[in-house]
Amino acid sequence: MRLTKYLLPFTLILMFSLLTGCTSNEKGETASKKQTDEKMITIGWPLDVGPLNPHTYLPNQMTAQAMVYESLVDYNDDGTITPKLAESWDISKDKTSYVFHLRKDVKYSDGTAFNADNVIRNFDAVLANRELHSWMGMVNHIKEVVKVDDYTIRLQLDEPYYPVLNELAFVRPFRFLGDNGFPEGDATQDAMKAPIGTGPWVLTDYKKDEYALFSRNDNYWGEKPLVEQIKVKIIPDSESISLAFENEELDLIYGRGIISLDNYTYLKDSGKYKTATSEPLSTKALLFNTQSGPLAELKVRQAIQYAINKEQMVDSITHGTEKVADTLFWDAIPYANIDLAPILYNPKKAQQLLEEAGWKLQKGEKIRSKNGQPLTLDLIYIATDAIQKPMAELMQGELAKIGVQLNLEGADVMVGLQKLMDNQVDINFWRTNGPPTDPHSFANESATPNANGVYEAKLGLPTAKEIDTKIHQLLVGTDEKERVQLYTDILTMFHDQALFFPISYETNSVIYQPYMKDFAPRASEYDIPYAQMEKEK
């Protein structure tokens, strides 16, 4: 990889060294490299950052979108909502009208204005594709977004929807593209001209599937980042990311599943590097497809959960960086601190349940059968996730002990999701969204077709329609006590029907070079705290 912007400074230094009689070009090169590296943080990432379209999803990487684009409000790790591009807001008594007062000191990275007209243009572009964004419940309730004055807008709902501010804080789709980034006709769902945002970083160099270089936004209205550039090196293989880090080609490795936990533990235990772990941010689980096949039976779903030694699996594979999950959400998630009895490891109970369900182990056979059909299940895991594959392989072995054949397939996340929604696979690895949208985004998606697979997976449950009704009631209701009870009912029904197999509460783990200053990883799926990163002088 050759970058002209780095060759020019080097050439000038070399010429100066020759003119002043310097006898060691090697020393000059070393000094130049050190100066450049001090101003840049390099991180490894398994996937290309994508086109950086703020209004669309994959292949856009959320971590990169969050560097360039900002929201009206911000969600903090303690669960509070604070101002961002909106300096304040007013909510009507009936909870259907939100008036946002925009900051007047904000410019886009190209120097153009951020104002009410631009905000409405972005809202209109997103709302032109309501179906695409239907997983976000607010989209289905926005009646109109109108300009009050140059720096004030009003968002009008058709009925109350309590998570409005949380959803506005999410990384997509309600973040803001500069006017010069819009395509002709404003159809941003198809393409955009350029990734122009108000955030602290601007994309300045990019080579697909190799790297993306972000430079500090000189027009940024907030506190400037401590370093000048962030380089994201695209390295699909987790082993190669670890090796690049050991060779000091990377300054840090950040996030869940980027490298194997074995490699993380090896690097941590070497004593050469710094490490940190965030608070829990999401839950890793299996999602069972109840539409047809063996998993349409409750006892089969329960048997699978009893058959897997979850505690041993989580400890051995995550090396303590994740906590065993017995419920779908950890207790600190709003409305999720519910007393639910966990399903504990009990292979004898698992076999008993399968016998009761009519799945018998015939003499000389290793796989149970019923009415001539073998008890065979298909599981899809994300091929690029360094943790899901070893977990899938361990579960494959555990289920074989009770007479269940588990077939494994590694695939792209969207391939697995589509197969589940099309009723072509039995089990998917699945995870909650985490802050700032849990648990309400989970609830909304669970009642929305073609969202995250839960709606389709639960179609075989006897309580499916009742769950959908309760979800609608809690999202539009204004009574807090009623909302608490509805969440309790919904989460209890999912738990009792064994639709999910909670595995672990995930965290962001970070390992960084000793010359990096300490920083705290955030309990966020997408917000990497680049602005706080700095190298020792």
Predicted regions, residues:
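Extracellular/periplasmic solute-recognition and catalytic clefts
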Residues: 146, 204-215, 231-292, 302-303, ...
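N-terminal lobe/hinge region of extracytoplasmic solute-binding protein
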Residues: 44-93, 124, 196, 524-526
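Extracytoplasmic/peripheral linker and loop segments enriched in polar/acidic and small residues
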Residues: 405-416, 444-513, 537
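Append "and occasionally in soluble cytosolic enzymes with long acidic Gly/Pro-rich linkers
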Residues: 296-397, 535-536
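Surface-exposed binding/hinge segments that line
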Residues: 137-181
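Aromatic- and charge-enriched surface segment that lines or borders ligand/interaction sites
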Residues: 87-132, 154, 294-296
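Gly/Pro-rich hinge or "lid" segments in bacterial periplasmic/extracellular proteins
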Residues: 77, 170-225, 229, 239, ...
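Long beta-strand-rich cores associated with HINT superfamily self-processing modules
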Residues: 510-537
